[in-house]
């Protein structure tokens, strides 16, 4: 598939902060093959997009999100963090089913794509459902399973390994997996040690 975007203002985000006005950008099989002020005659596009009065730039990255939480939007507003999280959100999350996370994630992804975000980092519940939504939507993501409840049996550790094996570098590398440190107020020392150990063994983060 060859796509040509013409008459578009390109914000390159390079070290010189260069902006190319009324430019042409050509894409072939998902890769940018040229950017120029002039159209190249030897590029025969299957589709042409007129970018007049539009801006083209690298996609935004959401560096911390819980996409499945989209379905809890506006729940328990106007509270301090401790009351909001421990008294309201965590009890509500205990009732969420895997399919709730799947649909909530798809909703969040659609909103991100609509507003220019093309990659995100996510750590939440039922992460296989999050990964499934990412695979279907075509967005890029770095996903982490929640390791807050490591127990003596190593159950969570095994689940994290399985998640890594099932999803890391899937969808032509669009999906990456890592081991998270969500926050210091939810992690105990053993969780940090086990997360670091897993990441080192799998040569990931």
PLM region spans:
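N-terminal metal-binding scaffold of metallo-dependent hydrolase/deaminase domains
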Residues: 1-43, 54
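Divalent metal-coordination and catalytic microenvironments
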Residues: 8, 25, 30, 53, ...
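Short beta->alpha connector loops
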Residues: 10, 120-127, 185-186
């Amino acid at each position: 598939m060859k796509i040509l975007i013409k008459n578009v203002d390109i914000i390159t985000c390079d070290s010189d902060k260069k902006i190319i006005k009324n430019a042409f950008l050509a894409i072939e099989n998902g890769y940018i093959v040229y950017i120029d002020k002039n159209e190249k005659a030897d590029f025969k596009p299957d589709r042409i997009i007129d970018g007049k009065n539009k801006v083209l730039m690298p996609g935004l990255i959401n560096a911390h999100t819980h996409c499945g939480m989209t379905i809890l939007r506006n729940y328990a507003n106007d509270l301090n963090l401790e009351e909001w999280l421990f008294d309201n959100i965590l009890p509500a999350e205990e009732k969420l089913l895997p399919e709730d996370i799947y649909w909530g994630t798809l909703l969040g992804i659609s909103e991100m794509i609509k507003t220019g975000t093309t990659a995100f980092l996510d750590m939440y519940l039922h992460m296989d459902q999050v990964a499934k939504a990412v695979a279907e939507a075509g967005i890029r993501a770095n996903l982490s399973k929640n390791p807050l409840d490591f127990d003596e049996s190593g159950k969570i550790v095994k689940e994290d390994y399985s998640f890594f094996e099932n999803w890391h570098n899937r969808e032509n590398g669009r999906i990456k997996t890592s081991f998270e440190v969500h926050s210091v107020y939810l992690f105990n020392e053993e969780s940090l040690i086990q997360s670091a150990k897993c990441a080192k063994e799998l040569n990931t983060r």
